């Protein structure tokens, strides 16, 4: 066969140029336009979110000796801390935000070890009363820990060890941190298989014992282990609504307790302690059975509580579906209702989620019944990215295409307002509102929580 260079060149042009043109078109439109039917996000959008999350977590690191705010001193804890976000916001180590971000996969083994043992070392070693009259029970876990002197602050609203515990933030520490402490240990074991850390003594008490003590700190109903509170002994139900007053039986911390019970059961299985493993399985089962009976309304929404603030709660509802607490019938009912609320514009804005549907506001002046924040700001009606993945998971149970749409709106807003574009940009924000209200740029759980949840969404 005669070799003809011109013929070969022309053939290559006919083959390569159309492919090149198609590639340019695809790149011009962006990978994010093309989402596989069975994936919640396109490959391009998922990679964007992973990279952004890794960048945000890196910007949230406080290295030994580093200072991020003049009044807070240097990091003298002996290891890296991860605060709730980048730039100057929240200059301390918050247990909650850190624990909720672990499943992003971007926290190293040594970083985990340091923050787990630091949290354990600041667990309350006695019951005491603050100068403001709040009670810190034996075994309580800090809300946040100072970086300069390592002192635990058990209550929101302050960085002062001496001034903590004012009435507006409860008379006992928030309930969620105890269960998230369990999650920190569980995730460390899950990712390192280093079981010996559970036997390590911290100030004379093993880590495993500390986990059990913490688990039993929040007050609970005797019959079913549901977390409960009263006006007199009120604790914050969960730190992402710490400017609200919510009383009675509490849904969100009970969901966290359910998850922590399963995690303790699995840890005891690994330690060959079947009796304890069975005990915590039983506790989880009782909580799972009680939650819909106590909190579910006729539409399938879970209310935040049975006392003050007993309003349908999007975050509790979505997280309960995410943790497989509801039955199949309940799940489908709730999923359809959330889908309808999303389509009607009552649930989200630019892919971010309200605590309460706009149709469920307490009245014209406030979203929550009792709030320290003005309506449509912060936790009282602004929109948050933290629960977006859980809500997508819930909606996907009955309408996968709609879940994809919500996820796409979330990614599109992150792309549009990506802080890497310049100092006037700040996404991921902690929360925002159509009025123009924004709060705390470069916020970690806004990307870390959805990233983890998106990885668990499969098309039914």
Please state what every model-predicted region is.
Residues 1-33:
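Bacterial Sec-dependent N-terminal signal peptides
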Residues 72-92, 133-173, 225-250, 298-319, ...:
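Carbohydrate-binding/catalytic loop surfaces
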Residues 290-295:
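Short amphipathic coiled-coil heptad-repeat segments
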Residues 91-226, 254, 385-388, 407, ...:
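Aromatic-rich carbohydrate-recognition surfaces in CAZymes
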Residues 31-96, 113-118, 127-140, 460:
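Low-complexity, Ser/Thr/Pro/Gly-enriched N-terminal "stalk/linker" regions
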Residues 48, 93-126, 202-212, 251-270, ...:
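Active-site core of glycosidic bond-cleaving carbohydrate-active enzymes
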């Amino acid at each position: 066969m005669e070799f003809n260079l011109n013929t070969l060149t022309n053939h290559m042009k006919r083959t390569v140029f159309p492919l090149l043109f198609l590639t340019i078109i695809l790149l011009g439109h962006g990978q994010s336009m093309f989402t596989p039917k069975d994936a919640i996000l396109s490959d391009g959008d998922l990679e964007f979110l992973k990279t952004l999350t890794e960048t945000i977590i890196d910007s949230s690191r406080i290295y030994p000796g580093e200072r991020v705010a003049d009044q807070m001193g240097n990091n003298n804890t002996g290891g890296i801390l991860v605060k709730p976000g980048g730039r100057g916001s929240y200059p301390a180590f918050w247990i909650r935000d850190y624990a909720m971000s672990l499943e992003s996969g971007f926290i190293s083994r040594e970083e985990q070890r340091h923050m787990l043992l630091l949290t354990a070392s600041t667990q309350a070693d006695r019951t005491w009363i603050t100068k403001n009259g709040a009670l810190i029970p034996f075994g309580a876990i800090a809300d946040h820990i100072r970086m300069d002197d390592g002192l635990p602050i058990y209550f929101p609203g302050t960085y002062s060890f001496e001034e903590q515990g004012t009435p507006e933030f409860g008379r006992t520490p928030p309930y969620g941190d105890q269960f998230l402490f369990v999650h920190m240990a569980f995730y460390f074991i899950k990712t390192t298989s280093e079981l010996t850390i559970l036997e390590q003594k911290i100030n004379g008490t093993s880590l495993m014992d500390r986990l059990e003590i913490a688990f039993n700190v929040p007050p609970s109903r005797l019959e079913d282990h549901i977390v409960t509170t009263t006006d007199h002994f009120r604790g914050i139900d969960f730190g992402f609504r710490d400017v609200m007053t919510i009383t009675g039986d509490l849904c969100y911390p009970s969901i966290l307790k359910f998850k922590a019970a399963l995690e303790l059961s699995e840890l005891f299985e690994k330690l060959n302690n079947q009796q304890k493993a069975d005990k915590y399985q039983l506790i989880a089962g009782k909580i799972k059975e009680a939650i819909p009976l106590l909190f579910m309304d006729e539409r399938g929404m879970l209310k935040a509580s049975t006392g003050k603030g007993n309003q349908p709660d999007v975050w509790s509802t979505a997280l309960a579906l995410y943790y497989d607490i509801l039955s199949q019938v309940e799940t489908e009912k709730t999923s359809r209702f959330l889908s309808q609320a999303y389509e009607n514009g009552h649930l989200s804005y630019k892919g971010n989620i309200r605590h309460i549907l706009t149709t469920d506001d307490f009245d014209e002046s406030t979203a929550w019944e009792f709030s320290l924040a003005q309506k449509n700001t912060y936790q009282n009606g602004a929109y948050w990215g933290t629960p977006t993945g859980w809500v997508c998971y819930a909606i996907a149970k009955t309408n996968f295409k709609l879940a994809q749409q919500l996820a796409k709106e979330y990614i599109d807003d992150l792309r549009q307002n990506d802080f890497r574009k310049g100092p006037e940009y700040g996404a991921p924000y902690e929360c925002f509102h159509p009025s123009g209200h924004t709060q705390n740029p470069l916020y970690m759980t806004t990307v870390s929580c959805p990233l983890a949840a998106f990885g668990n969404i499969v098309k039914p």
